[in-house]
């Protein structure tokens, strides 16, 4: 018989939950989950994936597939920005479109010409580097041609020909870790220039600055992870709006919202067994099931082998003395 020739095997939250429930004897093979038991294990699965997001669990492979690169434009007279999808958060996106005005824009113009409208759609947010400084934001009413856009009635402000234009559909998510940061110069959007900047690892580094609101291109940023967004503070107030931050970050794990467990698991295939057995381990006490040495060995193999895929440059060692009832990661960086 020939091989399948396919490589797209996937599982749903329900399938991971049922496999974990079978492992600890909550259900027999082929049985369906009771609604209350399903809700209990779905909640445990969500708690698990949130704990395993980013790098806090020391699973190096997670850095590869949750990595995103976002662009964060600057605002006038501002050095603290909130990154996240909430309405009050600042404008950053992992799919930022950057171009330039092909002709000057009058203060209240509704018809504008840009170098390229590629990837722009009606309803997108669009911002123009203004002649008076700062960025004026509005929405796109329609994309009329390869270079033409229509805007709603607005008082965004005047912008010069060649001014930088930013556009995006969705804001970036609150990220849970940052790996790199650069200051990007968009003077030539087709060939932007990146300048490396520092990431403060201690709030004291920022607090020791004698002038925190001095104008200038940022050379360092402070990153503070909040409950619903991530705060970015620059060490200077950016005066040049044809420049932006470009951050390489780790996105959070997705939620599993569907009450019946129909959501696909948003993990690579090599993590499926690790998720199954870690969920089994965390769920066993909830159902009064004993965690036996045999189950512990199955768990150890599944988790150890799963997390060794797609490694980055991180040194790991296994802690064999960890108690089997410990629901944290069995791995530690050094």
Map each language-model feature to its residues.
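Glycine-enriched, solvent-exposed interface loops adjoining structured elements
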Residues: 1-106, 118-334
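Short alpha-helix capping/helix-loop boundary micro-motifs
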Residues: 109-115
């Amino acid at each position: 018989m020939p091989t399948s020739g396919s490589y797209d095997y996937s599982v749903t939250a329900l399938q991971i939950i049922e496999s974990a429930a079978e492992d600890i004897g909550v259900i027999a093979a082929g049985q369906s989950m009771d609604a209350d038991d399903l809700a209990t294990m779905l909640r445990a699965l969500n708690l698990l994936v949130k704990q395993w997001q980013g790098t806090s669990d020391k699973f190096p492979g997670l850095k590869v597939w949750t990595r995103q690169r976002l662009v964060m434009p600057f605002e006038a007279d501002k050095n603290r920005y909130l990154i996240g999808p909430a309405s009050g958060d600042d404008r950053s996106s992992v799919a930022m479109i950057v171009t330039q005005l092909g002709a000057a824009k009058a203060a209240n113009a509704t018809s504008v010409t840009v170098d390229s409208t590629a990837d722009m759609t009606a309803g997108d947010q669009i911002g123009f580097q203004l002649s008076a400084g700062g960025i004026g934001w509005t929405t796109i009413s329609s994309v009329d041609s390869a270079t033409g856009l229509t805007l709603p009635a607005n008082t965004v402000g005047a912008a010069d020909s060649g001014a930088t234009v930013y556009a995006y559909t969705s804001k970036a998510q609150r990220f849970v870790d940052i790996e790199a940061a650069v200051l990007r110069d968009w003077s030539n959007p087709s060939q932007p220039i990146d300048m490396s900047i520092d990431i403060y690892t201690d709030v004291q580094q920022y607090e020791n600055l004698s002038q925190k609101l001095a104008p200038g291109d940022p050379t360092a940023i402070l990153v503070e992870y909040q409950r619903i967004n991530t705060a970015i503070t620059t060490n200077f107030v950016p005066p040049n709006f044809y420049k932006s931050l470009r951050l390489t970050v780790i996105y959070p794990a997705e939620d599993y919202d569907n009450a019946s467990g129909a959501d696909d698991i948003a993990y690579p295939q090599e993590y499926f067994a690790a998720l199954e057995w870690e969920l089994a381990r965390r769920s066993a006490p909830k159902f009064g099931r004993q965690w036996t040495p045999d189950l512990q060995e199955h768990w150890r193999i599944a988790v150890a082998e799963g997390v060794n895929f797609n490694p980055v440059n991180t040194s790991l060692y296994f802690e064999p003395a960890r108690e089997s009832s410990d629901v944290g990661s069995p791995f530690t960086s050094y």
